[in-house]
Amino acid sequence: MNNTEFYDRLGVSKNASADEIKKAYRKLSKKYHPDINKEPGAEDKYKEVQEAYETLSDDQKRAAYDQYGAAGANGGFGGFNGAGGFGGFEDIFSSFFGGGGSSRNPNAPRQGDDLQYRVNLTFEEAIFGTEKEVKYHREAGCRTCNGSGAKPGTSPVTCGRCHGAGVINVDTQTPLGMMRRQVTCDVCHGRGKEIKYPCTTCHGTGHEKQAHSVHVKIPAGVETGQQIRLAGQGEAGFNGGPYGDLYVVVSVEASDKFEREGTTIFYNLNLNFVQAALGDTVDIPTVHGDVELVIPEGTQTGKKFRLRSKGAPSLRGGAVGDQYVTVNVVTPTGLNDRQKVALKEFAAAGDLKVNPKKKGFFDHIKDAFDGE
């Protein structure tokens, strides 16, 4: 075998960059993979491409191959010793087929989990903003062992199985040959340290449930479902990683007077028919205090009045919303005789036709029994 055959298999020149070699390998690996290409000879082609890439993707093996050919590269490879192995090949293989090992370092610092807390607000608190104390329990660093997980007076030691790497190599025989992948160490669970004498409080986890409280400022104008993020107020991280975050979710209680949509507030005003017909001046409640509203003569049900800047503020700042007052003219019931006469005179004066139901025989009998 000459010193260019591996390059020829990948279709690149001897001066090709690492990116060009990787790109060519990805293309050919996908083209000839046995799970995709069922044509005769595809599997052999795939193995040849794999062999070429295993050598040319490693700088040391590539240098040995360029100087001594395949024999030099195989000598430099040294079987399955070391963590390098098929690392480069597996990362590429994983990107296509989801197999191989993980490139993530399980011993790396990792942020703790986020938490969520629901806070109830009155209608007015949501409008004007407030401050609340949030009390909850979270996983925090163990106070007995200061988060080390080891019994006081002892310390974690380097894991004897993974030698502190947090991962171990596992060789698997496949139809394509021996494959190597990295898995999380089953002794230290990726921490790289063994705890010979676990803390009796946290049982070696380094975490314990603790009561915690924090004050949160609720901005003016919030609505149900909106969240406020408090960085670092979640649960403790792993391997020295930072705490997670706390998300405070707002729940606003309904008002017995108002309804709200965004920055707009709505209020229903009941008027008797005299107020609606003759006009009046009434006090209207708003979240900012009562205001006087002049009701003009002849106001009908459904009429809307706008009170500027009497609504809710916007979370983004700027002008305050408005309040809309919707009129409902209430028809009186249970009129006495004097009121009925007055209404009949009103109808006659306006030439209004009114045809009330005349009482029949059974109506008079019913009235007689009702009067007993």
Curated annotation (Swiss-Prot):
CDD domains: DnaJ (cd06257), DnaJ_C (cd10747), DnaJ_zf (cd10719). GO terms for biological process: chaperone cofactor-dependent protein refolding; DNA replication; protein refolding; response to heat. Signal peptide: none annotated. Binds 2 Zn(2+) ions per monomer. One of its GO terms (cellular component) is cytoplasm. Zn(2+) 2 binds at C159, C162, C185, C188. CXXCXGXG motif repeats lie at residues 142-149, 159-166, 185-192, 199-206. Its main location: cytoplasm. It comes from the Bacteria. Gene3D superfamilies: DnaJ domain, Heat shock protein DnaJ, cysteine-rich domain, Urease metallochaperone UreE, N-terminal domain. It holds the Pfam family DnaJ_C. PANTHER family: CHAPERONE PROTEIN DNAJ (PTHR43096:SF48), DNAJ HOMOLOG 1, MITOCHONDRIAL-RELATED (PTHR43096). Belongs to the DnaJ family. Participates actively in the response to hyperosmotic and heat shock by preventing the aggregation of stress-denatured proteins and by disaggregating proteins, also in an autonomous, DnaK-independent fashion. Unfolded proteins bind initially to DnaJ; upon interaction with the DnaJ-bound protein, DnaK hydrolyzes its bound ATP, resulting in the formation of a stable complex. GrpE releases ADP from DnaK; ATP binding to DnaK triggers the release of the substrate protein, thus completing the reaction cycle. Homodimer. HAMAP family: DnaJ. This is Chaperone protein DnaJ. The lineage of its organism: Bacteria, Bacillati, Bacillota, Bacilli, Lactobacillales. The gene is dnaJ.
